[in-house]
Amino acid sequence: YIIEIEQNRYKVSSVKLSKTVMNKLRKNSKKKSSYASNKIEGNPLSEKQVNEVIESDERKHYLKPEQEVRNYFLALNYLEEKVNKKEKFSKKLILDVQKLVEKGASKEKIGLRGPMPPGVLFAVYDSKTGNPDYIPPEYCDIPGLLDELIEYVNTTDDHPLIVAAVVHYQLVTIHPFEDGNGRTARLLSGYIMDLNGYGFNGVGSLEEYFAYDIDEYYESIQMGLPALYYSGRENPPHPEIWIHYFLRMVKLYSGKVCDLQLASEEEDIAGSLSFLKGKEKELLQFLMKNYRGEFTPIEVSRELSVTNKTIINRLAVLVKNGFVIPILVKERIRSYELSEFTRDHETEIMKMIGSGKRRSSK
């Protein structure tokens, strides 16, 4: 699976999208992740409702399912900032993420879990039978187990995708919190991928693939082991069951991201060109053929035998649509240059302008 994921990663790295399109894709991906990750935990909201809740203005009171999806979205934004700062995996990061996931919940649900009242067993119960599905480690073992996980993440030579799978498994299994363990595990597993260059530009939702078959997700993470942590889950005999499942989901997700970004790239160029009139397209074509560096409206107007004002007006449209950028000197535009977007997509833009011309001349 890793070879195929690497191939998809390489394909995605060659795709260049405008800032506007990339931001839109990232936001939609975060919404999908917020929907899917909470769906795994039994959140009843539909994808449409999740979208509406995230887009709605901040208000004082939310229903619990609404608060949960907003919290997940906020946590994704928070981790995006941390990736940009290259922040290491740490206990503080784990606690901060869980605090965001449980924002609005009662105090005892935030932070590491403590002792239970005498005679009460802390366990994850089957909602239908009432029997314990999973009995996590004792609360007093949690700090040491987290320290071991953090040391592993920051010192191992394992492939980053294996590390992400281990973080996911261990945070669900150590179950350090009263609530929010699964969501925190999925967020921080994604963070490890992002931090190591496997975030696929923040596009697509890995959580979506876990949510497609929730039973398979839980069966893979449980690996057929007894309910008690100390009866095998602390050191699973066949970790490859979970690792293979995790990598298969990443492979499917990375393939979808490839398709999504390649399709978006074509739409992005065509969309930007659709705002240009014939003369503006001709000017863009001329600039791409004749200028590698800076140029001024006056020199372009002389070469094209049109007025300076006409060129300035056409350049304003090219600037607005991201093809050209103005160079300011003392807050005044002195010259222009082709944008990075234009240079990255020069061949495709030329082809699209050319095919558009041929169609209109029939």
Regions from the PLM with identified roles:
Residues Y1-K362:
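FIC/Doc superfamily catalytic core
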